[in-house]
Curated annotation (Swiss-Prot):
Signal peptide: none annotated. One of its GO terms (cellular component) is plasma membrane. This is NADH-quinone oxidoreductase subunit N 2. Belongs to the complex I subunit 2 family. The lineage of its organism: Bacteria, Pseudomonadati, Acidobacteriota, Terriglobia, Bryobacterales. The keyword Transcription regulation does not apply. It is a multi-pass membrane protein. Its EC number is 7.1.1.-. It comes from Solibacter usitatus (strain Ellin6076). HAMAP family: NDH1_NuoN_1.
Amino acid sequence: MIDFSLFYNSTDHFSIIPAVMLALFGCAILLFDFLIFPDPRQRKFLLIFVVLAEAFTGFGLFRQQAWLAAQNAPELSGFGGSVTVDGFAIFFNWIFLVAAVVVAIVSYKYLEISGEHHGEYYSLILFAQCGMYFLATGTDLITLFIGLELMALCFYVMVGFLRTERRSNEAALKYLLLGAFSSGFLVYGFSVMYGIAGSTKLSDIAAAIASRPPWDPMVFLALSTTSVGLLFKVSAVPFHMWAPDAYEGAPTTVTAYLSVASKAASIAFLLRIFLGPLASARAVWEPLLAFIAIITLTIGNLAAINQTNIKRLLAYSSISHAGYMLLGLVAGNDTGIKGIAVYVMVYTFMNLGAFLVIIAMRRASIIGEDLDDLAGLVHKSPGYAFLMLIFLLSLAGIPPTAGFLGKYYIFLALIQTGHTGLAIVATLYVAVAIYYYFKIVRSMFIREEMEKTPMLATSFGLRCALALTGIATLAIGIYPEPFLRLAQTSLFR
């Protein structure tokens, strides 16, 4: 008889309950869409499955959090250490859950206007989130790669979801080809790590690399090839080329999900690798990462200046935000890692909010993605105009919005670790960002409306999502203490 207890114990299923819930409900949506709801008018009920999936996922995360607190344990390991649930993983998974819920509830009306199918769309949201779960909890190269590819494959399909639009198809193809190319580098880097340690466990790899000099050729090869794959996922320069096309070509709801959840998952993945296996090689990667962060800030901010398509402008803005997060990793102290966590949290709300306003602009004949589409918005829909103003001020890092808090901790960490020059340069780019964000503000508040078209009636879900993101963006900036305590739990140990 085979003793399965050698391979499976009672904590294994507990460590992946949220992922199991997401996968089961994702499959259930596909089955119900095909067998139970063939009539397009019935497909609105599929959204209920997404809400239930997120409710069960949230309950699973809460139970894991409660177990760690009750046991006074720093982490919960499953499957022989391949999955580790700790404060870091739970924090990021709450971010994924919020992003998925917001995107799902605003997608119903958007899909109706676009004339696209609902079933596979909602399933892809859940399957992508399932992949993100393993990116945040994975402590084994195989687990991390499976999570990454599950997430990436879902986004390849979602970016090209508008099958009748050429730009959507082109964006998906470019994203797929470049994504596959970067995954090749990542796998090669993983294979070098396995060759160094003889194990796929991150802890074993960290010990093996620590026993070698930082400039060891094999360590440098593993670092350089792995970094290509990781930096592509966070859209850092020079691996950012896919982001503007993918953001512009994808459905706006997908762009919102991609810009927030995918970036948060990729940041979690990057932290797992750089603060785990590659931590002892900091002398090598810190100056390289600092250079890449500054170049990312430069290209992202300067390229955004001349954009007239709002989604493309926000794509370059997203690239620059990746640069700020990388600077937190360059600092590398507790303040820096806490700063990254705070930045990811506030970026989720303010960037989602900005894209939600774009979604609200969608009318029967106007997509609502160009600056001209927002002209005179304050006269037609002052609520949307002022919400967009709040989100843009936050993206620029202006107090008392949440965005200021994220940048403050990044800059503080840089100064604490002696990187004052980097902090000064990063601060200068805030001024550049204010300039191109003001282009949108100018269009909404100063320019006259170019075409007298009535606003499309927005759904209740969209109004709730806008209220949530707007309140969160202001609340985190005005009363940050509870949110800072939440970010403190995410410190990587």
